[in-house]
Amino acid sequence: MKPSIVAKLEALQERHEEVQALLGEPSVIADMDRFRALSREYAQLTDITRCFQQWQQAQEDQQTAEMMLDDPEMRDMAQEELKEGKAAIEALEQELQVLLLPKDPDDERGCFLEVRAGTGGDEAAIFAGDLFRMYSRYAESRRWRVEVMSASDGEHGGYKEVIAKISGDGVYGQLKFESGGHRVQRVPATESQGRIHTSACTVAVMAAVPEAELPDINPSDLRIDTFRSSGAGGQHVNTTDSAIRITHLPTGIVVECQDERSQHKNKAKALSVLGARIRAAEIHKRQQEEASTRRNLLGSGDRSDRIRTYNFPQGRVTDHRINLTLYRLDEVMEGKLDALIQPVVQEYQADQLAALSEQE
């Protein structure tokens, strides 16, 4: 490992001890914001420090094994230890490189998840419902909280569009690669000839950030329309104009919210989603300006970018970005997404490492 990397790891090891001491100070404990920030930093540094300590120990073990080579009785055992030690060091160095990659500050935050039916009519809306259920099950398995912000029901089930806020640790970092086009191939329940239909949905994932970090929105840039909500809701539905539609005139971004009975609550929810969308658009524009020719696994941000196909007759799901195919569609639709998500995350990290190597 390069001396510069070792020096950086030693500095992080010192910072880990420093943060540990700070977390025990009464003034820090009394300041909840600072305590939370330091706790997050400590958790990240703990992983790096633990891995670095294992690497240091492995290096010492290698030196001990090399000294044993001079002893004829111990030589065979020493050679075996050196072989195993070399493999362990290589694995630890790879892990340390990943841990040292620049962190997206949004990764630890929650997110807004939008699922929208595309081409395919009723079948697309039904599939949008299936996708939302899949993500909800995944969130449940991770102990994340899902709050529906807005939902427009499909005529025969599912959703024309559904927006949810997912809260928990590391939500955005896990789900941000889900943005893009999702295609389904299956035989609809209404299909009497047994023909396979192709439908599509789009998914957008945006980081949920504190209000203070959202872009400033000039009220004069907004057009706010009220209308009567539709869908489930008992007697209250269609009796008051509680639903809200907000249009951000400079960008043309439109957000609707009709989930709450209170117009005020619907407006607050719609504004939070609007702020996240505007921020996501600004970040995407900046990334495009900074982007090199290297492929971007986060996609172009264009909803038409097809990232995944779900083929029900074959029980197959394919991620087109990394040419990964799994024959576990039933498990995936029940929310077991790690087998799909982790390879994309790892590929993204490999791309980051390659980009850093080119810069050096």
UniProtKB/Swiss-Prot annotation:
GO cellular component entries: cytoplasm
The entry's keywords: Cytoplasm, Methylation, Protein biosynthesis
Modification type N5-methylglutamine: residues: 235
GO molecular function, one term: translation release factor activity, codon specific
InterPro entries on file: PCRF (IPR005139), Pep_chain_release_fac_I (IPR000352), Pep_chain_release_fac_I_sf (IPR045853), Prokaryotic/Mito_RF (IPR050057), RF-1 (IPR004373)
Record-linked NCBIfam families: prfA, PRK00591.1
Protein family per UniProt: Belongs to the prokaryotic/mitochondrial release factor family.
Cited function: Peptide chain release factor 1 directs the termination of translation in response to the peptide chain termination codons UAG and UAA.
Spans annotated as Disordered: 284-305
Post-translational modification: Methylated by PrmC. Methylation increases the termination efficiency of RF1.
Record lineage: Bacteria, Pseudomonadati, Pseudomonadota, Gammaproteobacteria, Enterobacterales
Compositionally biased spans, kind Basic and acidic residues: 284-293
Protein name as annotated: Peptide chain release factor 1
Pfam families in the cross-refs: PCRF, RF-1
Keyword check for Protein biosynthesis: yes
